Amino acid sequence: MNMEVDTVTRKPRILLAASGSVASIKFSNLCHCFSEWAEVKAVASKSSLNFVDKPSLPQNVTLYTDEDEWSSWNKIGDPVLHIELRRWADVMIIAPLSANTLAKIAGGLCDNLLTCIVRAWDYSKPLFVAPAMNTLMWNNPFTERHLVLLDELGITLIPPIKKKLACGDYGNGAMAEPSLIYSTVRLFWESQARKQRDGTS
């Protein structure tokens, strides 16, 4: 990862994104974890809004939705939201990553704000995903193929954990806890910043 000089001296800019999994009920908690350390902006897919508790989001975190993509653009020359967010962010984290959004990213689809950001992402910058889905969906052969494609893009997987799922089943597929997602990203960022300061790669 190539970090510009100013990214070493200022707060990191973290773009958090939620896709349509019931684990999106933890999205506000995730935003609070990161907002203590970094500048945070958030993106929520239409289906994730069934679970995201918007009133409990940190006051300093702006939440963008698909509607904002279109309402912010009126004519040629106006800023394009998914491009502006990609430019702004140092790191993107999709948590939770649903089976559907995983498949979209693996196939290169870009039919909402979240997937447009990923399609336009600069892969010299880190992108993390924390999947959340039913155990049989996680174990599905398509999921394995899709994860291989994400790995080839340079996307970092924060694996799901084994527990009793929202559907009542017990098994692997629950999103990693927000505290673990936060610590994983922060440790990565601080390691890269230290290497940058020391002049190593």
Swiss-Prot record:
Residues annotated as binding FMN: 20-22, 45-47, 98-101, 132
Cofactor binding, per record: Binds 1 FMN per subunit.
GO BP terms: coenzyme A biosynthetic process; hyperosmotic salinity response
Protein's job: Involved in plant growth and salt and osmotic tolerance. Catalyzes the decarboxylation of 4'-phosphopantothenoylcysteine to 4'-phosphopantetheine, a key step in coenzyme A biosynthesis. The enzyme is also able to decarboxylate pantothenoylcysteine to pantothenoylcysteamine.
KO phenotype (gene knockout): No visible phenotype under normal growth conditions, but homozygous double mutants hal3a-1 and hal3b are embryonic lethal.
Swiss-Prot/TrEMBL keywords: Coenzyme A biosynthesis, Decarboxylase, Flavoprotein, FMN, Growth regulation, Lyase, Stress response
Binding site for substrate: 134, 164-166, 175
Protein name: Probable phosphopantothenoylcysteine decarboxylase
Record-level Gene Ontology MF annotations: FMN binding; phosphopantothenoylcysteine decarboxylase activity
Keyword Flavoprotein in record: yes
InterPro entries named in the record: Flavin_trans-like, Flavoprotein
Cofactor(s) required, per the database record: FMN
Family statement: Belongs to the HFCD (homooligomeric flavin containing Cys decarboxylase) superfamily.
